[in-house]
């Protein structure tokens, strides 16, 4: 299977004619990866990890016995835990092979069984159990983990039920969102090493992984996911947190706003129907290039029909494009934060002149919410309008909804990355702070 489309992605430049190959950009070398090149490609799919107490190839000085079992080759697992979905698969593949909802089910007290062996968390396909009344909960809030016990249940399901692997036999690469607390990384290490006994792990900056999926080492990553949005400047592999922008609105807010618009037009949806509204959003909604002109189009031309699960048919009109205006006018959802385009320009203006010029031409769009039809073109129009003396360039990939995972797949496959794995023996010997020597 050819992976050329992943390792040398065809990146479409909005408003700039034919797509350009991302690999034609400047040198693919980054200080973070030392000699690692994104052109190393899929040949480096197997990862050296210690089995049991095996030593790393470039070991940290240890007081323990030097008699180690030999290294064995195994495939690394890449996991991207988002607010909406958790995506996972083996490093070296172009797309994640497994994707489940991050929302889990907790039995209501009246339906929960008594005894110590009762199941407390239902994950993935277990949610479709008609015999148990479940309360849906999400262990993440705006991209940040708030319930680690539930996250552990999700990972247990991913490893054992979805991928059907023994986690103690595979290195694991995890994505970490921008501006997350440092304790996130330490908790990940504790869970992976002490609960799942993984032989090695690495935690990578989420926006950096998104950038790698484009084949770049510098760029302005504009990421709009399910629970939070970010605008992250990255230079030669290094994120710039001091000028990173975070917006606490994203795809879930779009779903809620769409539901409110439909209810205002006479339909009857509640929070119990959010799954249906999510499907309506994905199938029927779009982003208008010019909402004022779009409103002038006769209403019947906007109408389409959507069939509900019970067979009933509803008609959708202008709410199909009005809902997405919240990204550019957050006051519509009672948010005091900047619009996505304004936040993007704000981050660019905080950069020095040389860096700003580089980032202007490398605006990289990522996240599932950017998959709405018309989203890239609208953002391009807004940025060009706000920066008439510059040439902002929005770049898009067809698979940008899985950009974080794909970047992790690329990174974990690079030969030059292999010394950056944190091994269990090193964690046991030096503690969680050893993470910061390899994960930065």
UniProtKB/Swiss-Prot annotation:
Disordered: annotated span: 1-29
A Pfam family of this chain: ACTL7A_N
Annotated region (Required for interaction with TES), positions in chain: 36-56
Tissues/organs with expression: Detected in testis. Detected at the acrosome of round spermatids (at protein level). Detected in adult and embryonic testis. Detected in developing male germ cells.
Chief site of localization: cytoplasm
Domain of life assignment: Eukaryota
UniProt entry tagged with the keyword Iron: no
Disruption phenotype: Male mice are infertile with consistent head and acrosomal morphological defects in sperm. Sperms show a smaller head size due to total damage of the acrosome-acroplaxome-manchette complex. Exhibit disruption of acrosomal biogenesis with abnormal migration of the acrosomal granule and a complete loss of subacrosomal filamentous actin (F-actin) structures in spermatids.
CDD domains xrefs: ASKHA_NBD_ACTL7
PANTHER family, A to Z: ACTIN
Family: Belongs to the actin family.
Complex formation: Interacts (via N-terminus) with TES (via LIM domain 2). Heterodimer with TES; the heterodimer interacts with ENAH to form a heterotrimer. Interacts with ACTL9. Interacts with CYLC1; the interaction may be relevant for proper acrosome attachment to the nuclear envelope.
Protein name: Actin-like protein 7A
Species annotation: Mus musculus
Gene designation: Actl7a
